[in-house]
Amino acid sequence: MDKQILVIGGTGMLGDSVTRQLREDGFKVRVMARDLQKAQAQFGAAYELFAGDVTDLGDLEQALAGCYGVHISVGGPADQISAENVAALAPELGLEHVTYVSGSTVRDENSWFPMTAQKLAAESAVSQCGVPYTIFRPTWPMEQLPRFVRDGRATLVGDIKTPWHWFAAADFGRMVANA
């Protein structure tokens, strides 16, 4: 397959599974990473690696050059700006698909929480950029379960009224690659 996909956030837990699945499915994969040494240690020479910052439009434009699509899997402060920057560049660069990782609790009624407000703004930018897109709102990857256990006891946050639905990061990688 000749389609090149840029993965932003490919060194993270979910980004890693997406990166590996895309390559397994025959896509050419370019990983944009702030820490090139970490990316090299994680992926070796099998992937095209691009050192850059998603908040820098010049870096992002270079990373997206020649790509069919892009997957955004960024957390923290760069999440919203990375999606907005991709949305600004995607039409002019001829991207044909954008995928973005949001979250299961990202809804208007939760916009009082800063991270949720940022995710909503990122979703809006992606959905309005004019390029076909898929937004994923996953729950919790089961690989995170150890973070919920302290001293042999499970930690629960809030008044849990509905069951949590866990997923495997590898399954998520397959869903994104299929999109």
Segments from the language model and where they lie:
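Oxidoreductase cofactor-interface core, primarily capturing Rossmann-like NAD(P)-dependent enzymes
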Residues: 2-44, 55-58, 65, 77-78, ...
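Cofactor-binding loops of NAD(P)H-dependent oxidoreductases
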Residues: 52
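N-terminal Rossmann-like NAD(P) cofactor-binding module of classical short-chain dehydrogenase/reductase
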Residues: 64, 68-71, 99
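Glycine-rich, N-terminal phosphate-binding loop of Rossmann-like dinucleotide-binding domains
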Residues: 73-74, 102
